[in-house]
Design a protein with these regions (language model features):
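Peripheral, non-transmembrane regulatory/ligand-interaction domains of membrane transport proteins
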Residues: 4-199, 205-206, 212-215, 219-226, ...
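Hydrophobic alpha-helical transmembrane segments and their immediately adjacent juxtamembrane loops
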Residues: 221-317
Length: 317
């Protein structure tokens, strides 16, 4: 995709256009300074507002100016962290001008690609407010999709730890929890933006637009609830992993203690027979096959002790 594309819907069909015009959707993906200046001058927008969404630390907000409205929200994104796929959030800028809508983002995003690929039905770039709300709605559903993906990853970790717990599982679980923290923070900030949109009198809205905005609010709240639920579940999974590790350690210690007890019997008896003591004090010392008899007694005692320990489940690893 080009760094700056222009689209417009005609008869519900999205097509790429060559010139700016009424009903145009201008898509800016990681624009250069010169491209940002060109758009800022063309539509009389402050350059800082055009570049705002390119700052990862930019907070979500609504800014209404005389000839344009700037909306910045956080959208989910995938990045490589510690050689693993991780989820984070990045800003998406939406600028409403007189007859166009401009979207600005630091990278390509499935939130916008869904519209370009025709996955979203019945949207029109000419209906700016409704189109913006459809973008926000798609953003909420994308959050929910990634949340379900993270929950499936957590389920796989739970299945693995039933057999063997590895350091990688602990790291993966921590990564998932960090991702949920990012999502929760961004969704709450987006919720504030949506609440402001419902109250702004300077932004003209039609009744059907307000209904769609209500749907966006519902989906955003649902995403927040899903995030909290999954955080609680991951917290429980982490406690489960800690319990499993402790139980396995306790079982290993009990097994080693049981082996030590079993091995102590032949050690003590052989130690006694190894002392420099007269043979008359040593049972079976002068008896034919005395060594074999003593070994048999040691074996029987060891077996009896092992059976007792097994019944007490001390020989279970």
């Amino acid at each position: 995709m080009c760094i700056r594309d222009r689209y417009r819907t005609d008869d519900r069909i999205l097509s790429e256009i060559q010139e700016y015009g009424p009903g145009a959707w201008i898509v800016m993906t990681k624009p250069t300074i010169d491209e940002s200046k060109s758009i800022a001058e063309r539509f009389e927008i402050d350059l800082a507002d055009v570049r705002a969404a390119l700052d990862d630390e930019e907070s979500s907000r609504v800014q209404v100016e005389d000839n344009y409205t700037l909306i910045i929200v956080d959208i989910p994104s995938i990045e490589i962290r510690n050689e693993r796929e991780a989820y984070t959030t990045i800003p998406l800028g939406i600028i409403l001008v007189a007859d166009c809508i401009i979207t600005i983002c630091a990278e390509e995003t499935p939130v916008l690609e869904a519209f370009m690929e025709g996955k979203v039905r019945e949207f029109s770039t000419k209906k700016r407010m409704r189109f913006m709300y459809q973008i926000l709605y798609r953003n909420c559903t994308t959050y929910q999709y990634y949340l379900r993906v993270m929950d499936r990853r957590r389920t796989l970790i739970e299945q693995r730890i039933q057999e063997e717990t590895e350091d990688a599982d602990l790291i993966d679980l921590h990564e998932l929890e960090s991702n949920l923290v990012y999502f929760a923070t961004s969704l709450r900030a987006n919720g504030v933006v949506l609440d402001k949109l419902t109250r702004y009198g300077r932004i003209k809205q039609y009744p059907e637009d307000k209904e769609l905005l209500d749907d966006v609010l519902v989906e955003n709240k649902q995403a927040i609830e899903m995030t909290q639920i999954y955080r609680d579940i991951i917290s429980g999974t982490r406690e489960l992993m800690t319990t499993i590790i402790n139980n396995r350690l306790n079982n290993a210690m009990k097994f080693l203690a049981a082996i030590t007890i079993v091995m102590a019997v032949p050690t003590v008896i052989s130690g006694v027979y190894g002392m420099n003591v007269g043979t008359k004090w040593m049972p079976f010392a002068n008896v034919p096959y005395g060594f074999e008899i003593v070994c048999g007694i040691i074996l029987v005692i060891s077996i009896v002790i092992a059976i007792i320990l097994k019944k007490k489940k001390m020989l279970k690893q």
